[in-house]
From Swiss-Prot:
One of its GO terms (cellular component) is cytosol. The active site is at K124. Its cofactor is Mg(2+); Mn(2+). The keyword Ion transport does not apply. Belongs to the NAD-dependent DNA ligase family. LigA subfamily. Pfam families: BRCT, DNA_ligase_aden, DNA_ligase_OB, DNA_ligase_ZBD, HHH_2, HHH_5, Nlig-Ia. This is DNA ligase. The gene is ligA.
C-alpha cells in the first residue's frame, strides 16, 4: 500500500468529519456542498479501490448496501424515562413546590419572580427519542426508546443520519458514553417527502413526528439517508467514569460538552433563574415560527447534584417537566355517542365525530370521560363539540357550542346496563368511573386477553383485538388460563385462521409459558401495577405466593411503591376468582420460576445511597447494583455528600479519591455483603 494513499484517505476523512461538525453543530459551513460532494466521492473511490483503507468512522460507512431483516431488542443501560406534563404556569408552580419539598427546601414566596432554583429550558422537539452508545469514542449502538427499559437496535439507520457523529470529537473519550437526543424531520424536508409521495400516488405522512419515527424503523438504511433526518442531543451519561478533568456538574455544562464532542445541540436552550424566567422563555417561543415542530418547553433542574438528590418517580424524573403549549382545538359535530367497556369494566362514553384534522391526524372519535363530565357539558347527539388532544395524544371533548345546537339534538346519558352483557352498571362510592361488575363481561374478557398478550406482558404474537374477540365469542375463552388449552384444530374453525396460522398462534401461546414472573404480574392487570412496578414487586416477592401473603404495610415500605399501589395489590389477591386464576396458571407452569426460589429479601439498605467503582472480585457491576437495590438501597453514578457508601474494587477510578476527600465510608465486596446478616456464605442472589 502506497503511504501517500493512506495519508490522503486519512486527510479526507478528517476534513469531511470536520466539515460535518461545522455544518450540523455550529451552523457554520467550511465547505461548499459541491466541494464536499467531490471530496466525498474521492474518498469513496479510494476505499473502493483499496478496501483496507475503510475505517468504521469513515463518512462513507453511514449507509449500508443491504436492508436489515429485523431489529433486535436491546436493553438500555440507563433507562429512558418519560416526562411529566404541565399545561399551564400554575401546574408548573405546583411541580416546583413538590420539587422543593423533595429537596428539603423552603417554598419561595413568589416562585414566578424570585425563584432560587436554576433551570435549563430546552424546546421540546416533536420527534422520536434516540439512545446512542459510544465505546472508546466510536459509535457502538443506536436504539429507539421503546418502553424506556428496552428498545430496538437500529444502528445501521443511525449511522445514516449525517448530524450524528460516528466518532467523538475528542482525543480522550470516556470508556463508555451514553447520549440521549431527539431525531426529527425539518418542516421543509417533511414537505418535500410528502410532495414526492403524492407524485408517486402514495398517501402522505400525517405529521413530521410520524414520518421521523417510521423512517427510523425502515429496514433499508438507504431510505433513512434519503429522508435527511436531523438530530438534537440533550443528555449524556458516563457510567464507567470520566476521562481526565472534572465531569460536567450542570445540565448546561452537559449541553456544552455535547457540542464539544461533535453533537448538534438546540441553540435556543437557555439557563433560567426561577420560574419567572422559565415562563418568559415559554411565552417567547410559544407559537413561534421554527424550522421544526415543537410542542412545548422542557424544564430541567440545572444542578446534576440536585437532580440526583431529587431522583425519580416510577415514571418520571422529579427534576424535569414538560410545559406543553396549549393544545390545538377544533369544532366538529357529534354523530353518535357509544359506551365503551374496558378490561377493568370501566365504562367510558365516546363521541363519534364527523372526521376532522387535529394535530396532524384525522380524528373521528373522542372521549367524554365519565357520567359527571357528560352532565357538566350537557352533551347532546348532534351538538357541535370543541375537540382537542389531551397531552397531544388522546382526543377529548372539552366544550359544547350550545348556540349551534340543532332543534333535533338528542340528550345523552350513560346507560344503566352494560352495553356488552346487560349487567346493571355500578358506580363505587367516591369514584367518578361507572363500572360493569360482571367478571364474565365479553368486553372485559377481550381486554384482559389483549393485555395479557401485549408486548410488555406475555408477548404473544398474533393475539390482537380481532383474535381476542373471536376467542371469547366463538371458543368460549373466559380467562387467560384458557388460552393454554387451545388446540390448532379449534382455531382453524375461526374466520381468517388456516392450518399454518393456527399452529403459529398455539406455538406463540405455549412459548409464553417461559415468561418470567414480573411479566406475568404485569399481565394480570392489577390496578396501578405498570411495567416498572411489576419489576420492583417481582424482585421483592419472587413467587406469586409470597406476594399474595404480603400485607399492604409491607408492600408500601418498598422503595418506589406507595400506599395506593400496595392496597390495590392486596385487594386484587383477596378476590377468590383471582386466586383461582393463579392456581390454574401455576398448574400450567406459569410463571416460569427458578428451581430454587429465593426467600423474600430484607430491606436493610432502605434509603442508603451507594456508588460502585473498580472491578469487584466475584460480582459484576450489574449484579452488585441488583443486590443493593433488592434490599432497598440506591446506586448512583457519582459521589456526592449524600452518598452513604462507596464500594471499591480493583483499579478504582476518581470516585475513590472523591470519597476519601468527602470522608465517605469505603466498602470491599465482602463488607458490602456483610451489611445484610441474613446472607449466607456463597449466597450472592439479589
Amino acid at each position: 500500500m502506497d503511504p501517500k494513499l493512506e495519508e490522503r484517505a486519512r486527510e479526507l476523512r478528517t476534513l469531511l468529519q470536520k466539515a460535518s461538525i461545522a455544518y450540523y453543530v455550529h451552523d457554520a459551513p467550511i465547505l461548499e456542498d459541491s466541494v464536499y460532494d467531490r471530496l466525498y466521492r474521492e474518498l469513496q473511490e479510494l476505499e473502493r479501490a483499496y478496501p483496507e483503507l475503510v475505517t468504521p468512522d469513515s463518512p462513507t460507512q453511514r449507509v449500508g448496501e443491504k436492508p436489515a431483516e429485523h431489529f433486535p431488542t436491546v436493553f438500555h443501560r440507563i433507562p429512558l424515562y418519560s416526562l411529566e406534563n404541565a399545561f399551564n404556569p400554575e401546574e408548573l408552580e405546583e411541580w416546583q413546590e413538590r420539587l422543593l419539598r423533595v429537596l428539603g427546601r423552603a417554598p419561595v414566596p413568589d416562585s414566578r419572580t424570585e425563584g432560587e432554583l436554576e433551570y435549563v429550558c430546552e424546546l421540546k422537539i416533536d420527534g422520536a427519542a434516540l439512545a446512542l452508545t459510544y465505546i472508546e469514542g466510536l459509535l457502538e449502538r443506536g436504539a429507539t426508546r421503546g418502553d424506556g427499559q428496552a428498545g430496538e437496535d437500529i444502528t445501521p439507520n443511525v449511522r445514516a443520519i449525517r448530524s450524528i457523529p460516528l466518532r467523538l470529537a475528542t482525543a480522550d473519550p470516556p470508556p463508555v458514553l451514553e447520549v440521549r437526543g431527539e431525531v426529527y424531520l425539518a418542516l421543509a424536508e417533511f414537505e418535500r417527502i410528502n410532495q414526492e409521495r403524492r407524485s408517486a400516488g402514495d398517501p402522505p405522512f400525517a405529521n413530521p413526528r410520524n414520518c421521523a419515527a417510521g423512517t427510523l424503523r425502515q429496514l433499508d438504511s438507504r431510505v433513512v439517508a434519503a429522508r435527511k433526518l436531523s438530530f438534537f442531543a440533550y443528555a449524556l451519561h458516563w457510567p464507567e467514569g470520566w476521562p481526565a478533568g472534572d465531569p460536567p456538574q450542570t445540565q448546561w455544562q452537559c449541553l456544552q460538552q455535547l457540542k464539544e464532542l461533535g453533537f448538534p445541540v438546540n441553540p435556543l436552550s437557555q439557563v433560567c433563574r426561577g420560574l419567572g424566567e422559565v415562563i418568559q422563555f415559554y411565552e417567547r417561543w410559544r407559537g413561534a415560527q421554527l424550522p421544526y415542530a415543537s410542542d412545548g418547553v422542557v424544564v430541567k433542574l440545572n444542578s446534576l447534584r440536585l437532580q440526583e438528590e431529587a431522583g425519580f418517580t416510577q415514571k418520571f424524573p422529579r427534576w424535569a417537566i414538560a410545559l406543553k403549549y396549549p393544545a390545538q382545538e377544533v369544532p366538529t359535530r357529534i354523530r353518535a355517542i357509544v359506551a365503551s367497556v374496558g378490561r377493568t369494566g370501566a365504562v367510558t362514553p365516546v363521541a363519534e365525530l364527523e372526521p376532522v384534522p387535529l394535530a396532524g391526524t384525522l380524528v373521528s372519535r373522542a372521549s367524554l370521560h365519565n357520567a359527571d363530565r357528560l352532565r357538566e357539558l350537557d352533551v347532546h347527539i348532534g351538538d357541535t363539540a370543541i375537540v382537542r388532544k389531551a397531552g397531544e395524544i388522546i382526543p377529548e371533548v372539552v366544550g359544547i357550542l350550545k348556540e349551534l345546537r340543532p332543534a333535533d339534538a338528542v340528550p345523552y346519558s350513560l346507560p344503566s346496563q352494560c352495553p356488552e352483557c346487560h349487567t346493571p352498571l355500578v358506580r363505587p362510592p367516591g369514584e367518578a368511573v361507572t363500572r360493569c361488575p360482571n367478571p364474565e363481561c365479553p368486553a372485559k374478557l377481550r381486554g384482559q386477553l389483549q393485555h395479557w398478550a401485549s408486548r410488555d406482558a406475555l408477548d404473544i404474537e398474533g393475539l390482537g383485538e380481532k383474535r381476542a374477540a373471536q376467542l371469547v365469542e366463538s371458543l368460549g375463552v373466559r380467562t387467560v388460563a384458557d388460552l393454554y388449552r387451545l388446540t390448532p384444530e379449534q382455531l382453524q374453525g375461526l374466520e381468517g385462521m388456516g392450518s399454518r396460522s393456527s399452529q403459529k398462534l398455539v406455538q406463540a401461546i405455549q412459548r409464553s409459558r417461559q415468561q418470567p414472573w414480573e411479566r406475568v404480574l404485569y399481565g394480570l392487570g392489577i390496578p396501578h401495577v405498570g411495567v416498572v412496578t411489576a419489576q420492583i414487586l417481582a424482585g421483592h416477592f419472587p413467587t406469586p405466593e409470597l406476594l399474595a401473603q404480603a400485607s399492604a404495610e409491607t408492600i408500601a415500605q418498598i422503595y418506589g411503591i406507595g400506599a395506593e399501589v400496595a392496597e390495590a395489590v392486596v385487594a386484587w389477591f383477596a378476590e377468590p376468582a383471582h386466586r383461582r386464576l393463579l392456581q390454574e396458571l401455576q398448574a400450567l407452569g406459569i410463571p416460569a420460576l427458578p428451581q430454587q426460589e429465593n426467600p423474600a429479601v430484607s430491606q436493610i439498605l432502605a434509603g442508603k445511597k451507594f456508588v460502585i467503582t473498580g472491578t469487584l472480585p466475584t460480582l459484576s457491576r450489574q449484579q452488585a447494583k441488583a443486590w443493593i437495590e433488592s434490599r432497598g438501597g440506591k446506586v448512583t453514578a457519582s459521589v456526592s455528600r449524600q452518598t452513604d457508601y462507596v464500594v471499591v474494587g480493583s483499579d478504582p477510578g476518581s470516585k475513590l479519591e472523591q470519597a476519601q476527600q468527602l470522608g465517605i465510608p469505603l466498602l470491599t465486596e465482602a463488607e458490602l455483603l456483610a451489611l445484610d446478616p441474613t446472607v449466607e456464605s456463597g449466597d450472592l442472589h439479589p
